[in-house]
Structure formats: structure tokens, C-alpha cells
Amino acid sequence: MFPGGGKFNPRMMKQMQKMMKDFGMDAEDLKAVKVTIELEDQLLVFEKPKVQVMDMLGNKTYSITGKAKKVAKEEEKIEDVEVKVEVTEEDIEMVSSQCGVSKEEAKKALEEANGDLAEAILKLGN
């Protein structure tokens, strides 16, 4: 790939970097500690990677070099928790008087609406 029998020549590297700049390309090394790529079913984790960003006419390309570890993706578990809402006597009276229903009906509507006065009134109004 490199002229000169494949041996690395630092002067040649400087010439290549100058040519890249002339063509509107710029490369910069980033001091990354860890890179994680999230796939559908797993994670790829690069510890101590070499990361280089190349800017070519405004488009940035990131190059990651290093050894990747495949890590199982943990499912985020959200548990359904039943919350019992305390319904105040004041709220029950308000819903009861607004809708012309008994206090028991007003309390039930408030509990079903998780204490939301407006929702309980709308529910009883229909």
C-alpha cells in the first residue's frame, strides 16, 4: 500500500496529511476512554479505543480501532405498580354536587380517575 517496499516513512505520512488537507480533508485523534455501540440485541464495547474523526467537506466520519467486547443488552424492566389514590371528602363533595350523583358514585369515579377531578366529572357527565 505504501511506496518504498511497504515500510513506514514518517516523511511520507506528512506528505499524505498535507495532500488530505489540500483536498478538504482533516483528521483528528480523539482521546476516547470507552466507545459503546448499541445494536438491536447486544452492545459492542471498546475499552481504550483509538478514535479518529475525519472531516471531509463538512461530513464527519468516525473511525474506531480496538478490540470490541460483545455484551448482552439488559432489558429495562418497568414494573406495573398499583397506586392507591387517597380521595378527600372535599373532592367527593365537589364531584357529587357538580354531577348530581351520590357520594358513593362520586368516590368511585374519582378512584377510577386516579383522583383527577376533571376526568371524574367528565366521566359522570356522559
Swiss-Prot record:
Cite the PROSITE patterns for this sequence.
NAC_AB (PS51151)
Presence of the UniProt keyword Protein transport in the record: yes
**GO BP term, pick one:** protein transport
Keyword terms, alphabetized: Protein transport, RNA-binding, Transport
Q: Which Pfam families match?
A: NAC, UBA_HYPK
User: What domain of life?
Assistant: Archaea
The UniProt entry, under CDD domains, shows: UBA_AeNAC
User: Which residues fall in a coiled-coil region?
Assistant: none
Q: Tell me one GO molecular function of this protein.
A: RNA binding
Residues in NAC-A/B domain copies: 10-77
Entry-linked HAMAP family: NAC_arch (MF_00814)
Q: How does this polypeptide assemble, per the annotation?
A: Homodimer. Interacts with the ribosome. Binds ribosomal RNA.
Q: Which family does it belong to?
A: Belongs to the NAC-alpha family.
* Described function: Contacts the emerging nascent chain on the ribosome.
This one is known as Nascent polypeptide-associated complex protein
